[in-house]
């Protein structure tokens, strides 16, 4: 078999595999369209309120309202394969990262965390810290 014939044979296999695999991906796109939703941001004395729970309420977004008492922290966690946005409604605190860096958290500020970022939010003020977080999948 000459070089040109072997090249064509070699290229045919990956193309056939790609076509075959792409057929399995088609049904995953049949998710029902999410509906409009309004959520009152009142925790009724609780420290957490789920705003969006992910599919089928949204395409990839999850969201919640956190309320931290003075000196309370949400706990160290990673964004994983998600982006995260925090919108601070009330209070002040600090967001700490594994590398030792810190960001001030205060009312009327929004903070963005990229994927694969370990962080923690702690209330450093004398009143409650209230913020809404929104996470969206990057995959």
Task: Describe every region a protein language model picked out.
Residues 115-139:
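Ligand-binding loop in jelly-roll beta-barrel domains
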Residues 60-63, 83, 116:
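Extracytoplasmic
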Residues 18-62, 70, 75-76, 96, ...:
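A short, N-terminal "cap"/entry segment at the start of jelly-roll beta-barrel domains
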Residues 56-58, 81, 100, 126-127, ...:
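Short strand-connecting beta-turns/loops that link adjacent beta-strands
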């Amino acid at each position: 078999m000459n070089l040109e014939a072997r090249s064509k044979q070699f290229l045919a296999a990956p193309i056939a595999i790609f076509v075959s695999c792409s057929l399995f991906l088609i049904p995953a796109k049949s998710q029902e369209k999410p509906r409009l939703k309004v959520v009152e941001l009142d925790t009724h004395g609780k420290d957490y309120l789920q705003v969006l729970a992910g599919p089928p309420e949204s395409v990839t977004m999850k969201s919640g309202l956190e309320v931290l008492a003075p000196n309370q922290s949400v706990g160290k966690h990673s964004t994983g394969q998600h982006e995260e946005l925090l919108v601070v409604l009330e209070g002040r605190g600090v967001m700490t990262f594994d590398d030792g860096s810190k960001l001030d958290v205060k009312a009327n500020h929004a903070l963005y965390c990229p994927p694969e970022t370990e962080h923690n939010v702690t209330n450093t003020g004398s009143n409650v810290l209230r913020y809404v977080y929104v996470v969206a999948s990057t995959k």
